[in-house]
């Protein structure tokens, strides 16, 4: 993909996501729109601009209902036939029941995908599907990891959490089985972890989901850790 049109909501997270694309993408960015958050759910004007600009791809960050509406309107505009959609936090187990087959074939990036092959993750996904009848989202996976991380510190300290420095030290060891596989902290306490390319597909039972097709970045560190005074 040699050219992209970027879109996201006009608030801190949206600005950060698009800044990350600008910092790392090697092709041409031929347009960018920040839309009003959270009020704007009509993207027809922006989609018309994209059609006129003729990029080779669209990159979006629209969590929740906004992602649902964007995917529907992208398809309704006909751009889904000519301009591929790339996304983060916009197509997932929570939004796919509403986006349905309109999202098929779209690509995204995430630090956790439900088909990651480690045993802890296999058991988590199987148990979740058995109980709820749907795939878990990465919000659920991150929450599970957070619980297991805190539990590992509590167990190491035999339940005595009165000394916060000791609690922090145990948490930083990350001595637990993460759903993401290998998990560790950088010097600035941000995770060092892989990011994966995910494709929206149907599973063998016809349920919409995402699957891993490649590792985008291995042992990724956040871009600013060297500037952090924490060493």
Segments from the language model and where they lie:
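Surface-exposed patches in mature extracellular/periplasmic domains of secreted proteins
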Residues: 3-9, 135-141, 161-166, 182-186
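Catalytic-loop motifs flanking and including active-site residues across diverse enzymes
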Residues: 17, 66, 142-146, 193, ...
């Amino acid at each position: 993909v040699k050219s992209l049109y970027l879109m996201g909501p006009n608030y801190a997270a949206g600005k950060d996501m698009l800044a990350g694309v600008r910092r790392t993408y090697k092709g041409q960015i031929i347009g960018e729109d920040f839309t009003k958050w959270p009020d704007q759910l009509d993207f027809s004007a922006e989609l018309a601009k994209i059609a006129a600009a003729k990029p080779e791809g669209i990159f979006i960050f629209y969590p929740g209902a906004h992602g649902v509406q964007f995917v529907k309107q992208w398809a309704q505009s006909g751009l889904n036939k000519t301009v591929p959609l790339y996304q983060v936090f916009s197509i997932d187990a929570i939004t796919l029941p509403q986006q349905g087959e309109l999202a098929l074939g779209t690509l995204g990036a995430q630090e956790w995908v439900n088909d990651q092959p480690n045993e802890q993750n296999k058991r988590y996904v199987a148990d979740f599907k058995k109980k709820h009848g749907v795939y878990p989202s990465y919000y659920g996976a991150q929450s599970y990891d957070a619980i297991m991380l805190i539990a590992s510190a509590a167990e190491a300290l035999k339940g005595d959490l009165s000394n916060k420095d000791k609690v922090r030290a145990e948490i930083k060891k990350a001595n637990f089985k993460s759903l993401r596989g290998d998990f560790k902290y950088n010097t600035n306490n941000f995770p060092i972890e892989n990011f994966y390319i995910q494709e929206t597909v149907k599973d063998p039972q016809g349920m919409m989901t995402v699957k891993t097709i490649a590792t985008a970045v291995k042992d990724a560190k956040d871009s600013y850790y060297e500037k952090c005074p924490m060493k």
